[in-house]
Amino acid sequence: MSLLSKTRELNTLLQKHKGIAVDFKDVAQTISNVTVTNVFIVSRRGKILGSCLNELLKSERIKDMLEDRHIPREYTEELMNVKQTESNIDIDNELTVFPPENREVFLNSRTTIFPILGGGERLGTLVLGRVQDDFNENDLVLGEYAATVIGMEILREKHNEVEKEARDKAAITMAINSLSYSEKEAIEHIFEELGGTEGLLIASKVADRVGITRSVIVNALRKLESAGVIESRSLGMKGTFIKVKKDKFLDELEKNK
């Protein structure tokens, strides 16, 4: 397969995901297919965003890493110290992705490391490993292209997260401001009663304890639910199950006391 064909295969995957978050497992699988390598896509803090492994699955240590979804802290630091592509690293180098304890099995292995950059900052690392055969110039071109594309996708996801947080905060602020004084007081007592972000509420008990009517509690919950801040489900005589949908709601409620 030519370099152009391999690049197009990666592009095809990205076009399928246009407008939605890319699954980095799929990206790792595609990179593995076109480069015939074991692949790790790792965040700057060592979280495994995506991987596609073949020979490396023989290692118990690698299996444990996949289960934890993290690579060791020491190796993460070593990767973050790599500022530009380093290719054809052998098994005796501390940057090898292959387990040194299995040196005999991976004696001819080669590791290549591609820093993932975006927006002027280091976002993570693309690590490719082969049991044998050096990485050639075409492999390096493809790897650097893949690292660039991954960087763009990570930045896009970060941007989407920031936008979502802003929308959520606006929705929470509007919902809290829509409550009357007594409704706001009722909500504060409800979440004190729940002691967390979800739980079972018996409205009549809260109403009696605080000295407000049950209708105030019902109206307050209805306003928050219509704003998408909470969800509630009646369980009949048992009460009402309540769950917070917006992560920052309780923090904002505390600030508005």
Swiss-Prot record:
The keyword Transcription regulation applies. GO terms for molecular function: DNA binding; DNA-binding transcription factor activity; GTP binding. Residues 1-155 are annotated as: GAF domain. It holds the Pfam family CodY. Keywords: Cytoplasm, DNA-binding, Repressor, Transcription, Transcription regulation. GO terms for cellular component: cytoplasm. Residues 203-222 bind DNA. It is found in: Cytoplasm. It comes from the Bacteria. Its main location: cytoplasm. GO terms for biological process: negative regulation of DNA-templated transcription. DNA-binding global transcriptional regulator which is involved in the adaptive response to starvation and acts by directly or indirectly controlling the expression of numerous genes in response to nutrient availability. During rapid exponential growth, CodY is highly active and represses genes whose products allow adaptation to nutrient depletion. Belongs to the CodY family. This is Global transcriptional regulator CodY. It comes from Staphylococcus epidermidis (strain ATCC 12228 / FDA PCI 1200). The gene is codY.
